[in-house]
Each structure stands twice: as C-alpha cells, then as structure tokens.
Amino acid sequence: MIKIRKGLDLPIAGAPAQAIQDGPIIQHVALLGEDYVGMRPSMLVQEGESVKKGQALFEDKKTPGVFFTAPASGRILSINRGERRVLQSVVIAVENGGDEQLEFAHYPVAELAMLPREQVESELLASGLWTALRTRPFSKTPAPGSTPRAIFVTAMDSQPLAADPQVIIAEQLAAFNAGLAVLARLTDGKVHVCHAAGANLGKQPDAQVTYNEFAGPHPAGLVGTHIHFLEPVSLKKTVWHIGYQDAIAIGTLFTTGKLDTRRVVALAGPQVEQPVLLRTRLGASIDELTAGRLKAGENRVISGSVLSGTHVAGPNAYLGRFHSLVSVLQEGRDKELFGWIAPSPDKFSITRTTLGHFLKNKLFAFSTTTHGGERAMVPIGNYERVMPLDILPTLLLRDLLAGDSDSAQALGCLELDEEDLALCTFVCPGKYEYAPVLRDVLTKIEQEG
C-alpha cells in the first residue's frame, strides 16, 4: 500500500448518501468539444439528422480513425460553435428512450484474454470507447496504432463529494473484470488497477493486471498521483489511463456487443437539497439532472469537482465526458466589511488565519467567493502542504506563470494534468489559476519538444 501524507480533504458540506437511485428521464444529451484536448472535429452529421446510439458524429482531423459517437439515439438538435468555430457541443434530442443502437461484435468471456490487439483497437475505435482512454503526458486521446508502457484504471476517487467507486463497481463486477481483460490486450506492460485501501474489487487471475492500494488525503485518488509513484512518465515514456465506469463499459461492449452509456454520478454540495448518487446517461443535460433538487438562491452548477470541474452554462450545460460528479455551490455575491480581521468560525483556511482552521470536525458551506483578488505569489509553504508528489511546487508554479517551458519540464510538469494543480490553486494566497497556464506550457512542450 502507498500512503501519502500531504494533501487536503476539503471539509465541505453536502456529501452524497452512498446508495444509487434512478435519475430523471433525460431528454437531451451532448458531446462537449472541451473534453478532448487538441481535438479538431470533422463533422459526419448535420442538424436535424437522426442518429443511433454508437453512430459516429465526428472524426478527429488530427488523429484520423478516432471517432466520437452518439451516447443516445435521437435527432441532432444543434451543433454549437464558439469563437474561431471551435466546437462547443453536439446536442441530441433523445427519442424513444434513446436506446436504438448499432450492434458490435461480442465474445465469450474466456476468449477476451486471447483477442488480437488490432481487433480490440478496431472495436474500441468503431464504438467510440477509444476516446475514453487518455495519455499521460498531455492528456490527449491516444493515436490509433500506438502502444502505452502501461495502462492505469482509476478505481478510487478522493475528490470532494465524490461517489464511492466500490458501490458502483460492485453492481457490475463481472463487466469490470471483463474490461480489465480487454485493456490488457492493448499493452505489453501492466494494467494498474488503483483503489482505496480495503476496497474489495475481486482479483483478476491474469498476472498482467496488478492491484495497487492508495491511502491518505486528496489527491490520493487522482491518476496523476498513481502514475507518479508507479510509472513516472516523460517525453519518451507514455502511459494511458481510464476511469472505472469506462472500464465497465468496455467489458459490457465486448461481452454483449452493446454500447453502455449509463453513468452513475454524485449530485452533491451545500446547495443540493438531498445529495445522492443518480443513475443517468453519458452527456446528460445538467438542467434536467438537477431539476427540483437544488436549494433556492443563485447557484453555480459544476460538472466535476468543486476543485477542478467546469462551470456549466449555455451550450456546455451537459455532463462532462470524464465526470462522475455534479457539484453545486452558492454564488458568493456578498461583500464583507473588515472580513480579513474577523475571527470567522464559518470560514475554512489551510493557514491559521481563521477560527475555522481549528474546528477539525466542522463541515463548511463553501460558496464561490475567493475572498480577495489576484496579488503577488507569496511562498509561505501552502503548496508544499498539499503536494504529495516528489516535485518542488513553488518553483514549478512560478515557471508555469512565467511560461518557462524548459524549466517547468525539468521540474516535472509532464507528469501533471489540470486536476493535479487544483489544490495549489485552492490554497494559493495570490489567487492564481494554475490549470490554464499548465495547459499552455504542455501545449508548448508538445509542439516544440
């Protein structure tokens, strides 16, 4: 077991009950362009056209052969583009339950471990489940024909308010194990299943599949942490990773021939009336998913974690491709007179500047207030408290802000994704957002080497 000591479990109110309920009937689903780093779509459908679940909607121009498929059957309601015609979303109006679908090849469970790699890749590409895989470094969809040094399956989640993966995997353990057998065909290295200490996920007889326990505060459950300790990456060493619900979907596809776009998500946060786990579908409309479940007031709905999720609004108001959590916070519009000098028992701080810091068992109703604007980046040790990886966070963050890609690469930025720096943003006394500057530097490194 690997136990980390640095990090932070955010003491936020509104954690969900760990029991799955059926969610509302979803009438609209969407694929979001922002979920896929560096993707340039070549559209294969038009507005008004009817599609089946699993039918290709567009192909990536940069990596031909990578298709993005419909998560439900219905009619293409809108294809939304932003500035410079960047794809925002492809919205589908679900019809007849949304389950009219294309059929794919399926196999007996005993044959999965013997399938040729090319056959596995071909079916994943055709079904669209290839896009569930992401590379590290750069967090992009893998190129067809490439081979990773290892594959990581993230079967734990330490993000604030997250669902317990063990509850979800227990319902579909056979499909999960089948998915692991299929994933093992894509690499000559290990398939690392990373789970929380004490979790019972069964065991694969295949020696290629290894189970790794992690314990400690967030980010113990992030794939970046797992990769850092087990298979550190570089420009010459690439690994892939995938979420546990996508591993279940792959197992279902190869054993039944049907594309499984079901998704269990946690609807949680201080502004949710009854935080709960809901069974819904991939790309579900957030407005429909949260209808009648939020407290009164001006709320900010986030697809993903409060630390690293996406504010949903307009054409992007749909469940993110890689999210299994919808968080809701109150918009912080109120101004506080002399708030910096008040004892503040209802405010949390990682430093000893508020009374709330000393209330160890208290849960806080966080809002979107940042309690200040941008200022100088002051190195007072906050970043080191929440960064368990073997890097120098203050120096790295400084170089990211300066856009110094050479120094940032030497300090380990290739191991990171936006979510890995979310805690650094949260505890930053200068109120900087480190995720976008990390992405800018990673893009520069990828282009220039």
From Swiss-Prot:
Gene Ontology biological process terms, A to Z: sodium ion transport
Entries under InterPro entries matching the protein: NqrA, NQRA_2nd, NqrA_C_domain, NQRA_N
Keyword set includes Phosphoprotein: no
A GO MF label: oxidoreductase activity, acting on NAD(P)H, quinone or similar compound as acceptor
A Pfam family hit: NQRA_N
The enzyme's E.C. designation: 7.2.1.1
Catalytic activity: a ubiquinone + n Na(+)(in) + NADH + H(+) = a ubiquinol + n Na(+)(out) + NAD(+)
Keywords (A to Z) from UniProt: Ion transport, NAD, Sodium, Sodium transport, Translocase, Transport, Ubiquinone
UniProt keyword Hydrolase present: no
Function: NQR complex catalyzes the reduction of ubiquinone-1 to ubiquinol by two successive reactions, coupled with the transport of Na(+) ions from the cytoplasm to the periplasm. NqrA to NqrE are probably involved in the second step, the conversion of ubisemiquinone to ubiquinol.
Xref: NCBIfam families: nqrA (TIGR01936), PRK05352.1-2 (NF003759)
Similarity section: Belongs to the NqrA family.
Protein's recorded name: Na(+)-translocating NADH-quinone reductase subunit A
Gene: nqrA
